[in-house]
Amino acid sequence: VTLDLQCGSALESITAAAAKIESGLADLVIAGGFESSSTQPVRMWNSNHPDYQEGKSYTVAKFIPDIQGEQVMLEGAEKTALTENVTKADMDPWVLLSHKRAAQAAKEGILSDIQFSIADSKKDEGIRPSMSQRLLDRLPCLLPGGSIITAANACLMHDGAAFVVLCSEAYRKKHGLTPQAAFRFGTAIGSDPFLS
């Protein structure tokens, strides 16, 4: 089954899997999600559609009103930072600390037992061990007229996937499995993307 709840798709698939197990319709379900920015389709409206413009394409699926453009997540991040009085200077130390911790975790192989390689690579290309304040100071803001969101403190465009195996207590006992976690409750709540 494929669920599309945009950013919440993986959580929703796990919640649906748990509900299926709880209802007795399944004993074991693999659930999760993936995103592949490198294979993201480029779309165009058909020439008979009112939104058609010669040579204009879009990549963000039109699940959202037209007032929200291709950069709605960046715009939302910028607006939220401004609303909450968070400056780029406030964010920079967290950016540096995050990359430092991620690089250390990668070096120590903390996640190596739950990562697998694709094309002989396990490297997380989002980690920048050489990130410095000097580099952060040089990065331009991503939005015209923006003052906060840069390539260093924004979400990455990436390819990635994560899945979990959920099972009933009866299945777990029958097969002698040791759980790593227990699912208690899940919910999805939508909000204004401009306040991401």
Residue locations for each model-derived region?
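N-terminal extracellular/periplasmic Venus flytrap/periplasmic-binding protein-like
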Residues: 90-174
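Active-site-proximal alpha-helical scaffold in enzymes
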Residues: 5-35, 81-111, 164-170
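Conserved catalytic cysteine-centered active-site region
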Residues: 1-27, 67-72, 130-156
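Flexible glycine-/small-residue-enriched beta->alpha junction loops
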Residues: 28-79
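Glycine- and Gly-Pro-enriched alpha-helical subdomains that act as flexible
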Residues: 169-196
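Structural motif
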Residues: 27-29, 147, 163-164, 180-182
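Acyl-CoA/ACP chain-elongation machinery
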Residues: 33-41, 119, 189-195
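A short small-residue
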Residues: 74-83, 184-188
